């Protein structure tokens, strides 16, 4: 039998592949994740099996120092914490809002309840930006009353409504206009947000963006301070960011020439790709920031306008790599796929209710046993959840050690973004707990839901 047929990994014998399975790729796992001599994985000095025993599984474990370090990395790359707005849609709690505040970053939110969470954490309204394509009067009124630093306008209807609400409150609301520069991001269709045929923003090509800018400039209770664009999420082609900036700056020039207004800010959103598996490489944010800021300065000079301050909105790139989800292995079965192929199905005690991304986007993850070393030969494996849904798959195709057994703790890395945030109660599953770890100590951020929580909504 060749090494390739043993493992599915060309040139890698089974035992060597098992050794690789014991490794924790540094570009995927939290910075403070370590496999100890007994095979147990710790994060920030806290053994994951101890956390699983205390808080149950599934369990989200957040490396606080990793999260904070990524905030500082972004601030350093883009010229200061005031230039960086953490995209709270990735994952938000009062604790996270406090971390972001303490690191000096701003915050972007996309619903009235996200705003409520931020305010409950005493996050300053002046450092909050409100997003959304369908903000209602209640949401907009809350933005104005809490003195939000920016409201990102997404439609002519919203522009008129916000002007009316601000007038009623006796205030002038700073706004950005979301622009579609027509860039096709190299990402999944559902997370590409800058092409023409989608729900967000005003078209640059059709002239709708300029019309919106003119309306905002003429509105008595709005202050147009800049433009916003976002090419997509989990983007690895860095050229798209610079190209989008160049196209949007042409609108800055037109606004300056025809409306006599110099816009001070350019918000280029986020979308910086991270590694979910060992085979992937995260986008180098330092290089992207350098290229982006250089492109903005160069293009502004060519257009004869003052270069605006560049703002960015990373979410996944901060929250994603800081977190792992710990599951307990349950049922294991071998399924004959055809006459020559057998696939091992490993079921865990969570699934699409705590991580919908594989089902929704075809997202790929990698897993590791974190309660011990694995030593077995490898086998074709699929990791699935416990839900009554054939698409409840966490890892579709993998080659994992054959000695994984019921009761093992299996962890998926890079689950800090869009996992808990998009969680559900499908099959009446209770949402998992979220625990932060730092310097050998754990702190409960969000408790595990109970049946009583689910029943509390009944009337």
From Swiss-Prot:
Subunit structure: Homodimer.
Protein name in UniProt: Diaminopimelate decarboxylase
Keyword Ribonucleoprotein carried by entry: no
Species, as recorded: Corynebacterium efficiens (strain DSM 44549 / YS-314 / AJ 12310 / JCM 11189 / NBRC 100395)
NCBIfam families: lysA
Lineage top rank: taxon: Bacteria
GO biological process, one term: lysine biosynthetic process via diaminopimelate
EC number of the protein: 4.1.1.20
An example Gene Ontology molecular-function term: diaminopimelate decarboxylase activity
